[in-house]
């Protein structure tokens, strides 16, 4: 058996390993803001809010999927749109009776800054960011700060902290018991810590799955669309290699024809509503002689086996095997994962 290359350790790996602490800090911060619920209710009542627009770019956009589902199922008129598309093609979304929820880890993304500074907003805005003095934090009517701490390159701990903040916001909208919400977030942090305790074994086992692979797909449905979108993004960003994140349904409408021994399909099992559909896609990928990994509680691969959790929190756990895969692929290619050559941490240009 050929020698398995060692992961070249750097800032990205350190940020990944810091995720449990970042999550715990964020949970404590959210639970320590007793007036947040009242402030949100006041903001919605004062502005006679009739519609909610969820917006962001990159992983901040993908992280909105669980909240979009939860709010829509609860009867809220809710739209999810990339900020750039909204600015150029759907500016009328931001009417005076619309509450905008904008997510940006830096709070300085070009599109978010334009949204705030160029007169698009007619109604109130809730900003979720990791940066206290950012444009988003300063100009939002209500700001929810995550406590991920500084992050060097590829999004990881800020993404998980953002998912937590969005889950908390959803719990407020749905009038759920926040003590229980806090406990679920604490439990998720413990599971992340337990998983990352085996990071070296996980990356080593995933390197074996990458032999001869030229293309990676990451798929999911429902809440797991957050994982598919962010997973494809961070694989490209951290390894400079072709990877695509899309829904499992969209994968059947064309990309499935690409299945071969040179393709790795990472399929999120997801929640009970569509788990059987994702399981069937996984089995069909194997029959097509592609390499396939099932991410979830029913996986037969140790690095992809995850515990059960509330469905809206699945993306917090599902992204961990993708992070390990990015470390494994970069190691095979002989460079440090997440070491930017062309990109920068903050996308300041549209």
Residue ranges, per PLM feature:
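Composition- and surface-driven signal marking solvent-exposed, interaction-prone regions
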Residues: 231, 278-281, 318, 341
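Glycine-rich phosphate-binding loops that contact phosphosugars or nucleotide phosphates
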Residues: 43-190, 221, 264, 268-312, ...
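A cross-family phosphate/adenosyl-ligand binding-site feature
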Residues: 3-22, 126, 150-159, 306-319
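Peripheral docking tails and interdomain loops at the edges
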Residues: 305-350
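Residues at alpha-helix termini
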Residues: 73, 237, 287, 331-332
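Active-site phosphate/pyrophosphate-binding segments
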Residues: 11-53, 142-145, 149-264, 334-350
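Short, charged low-complexity linear motifs
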Residues: 1-4, 237
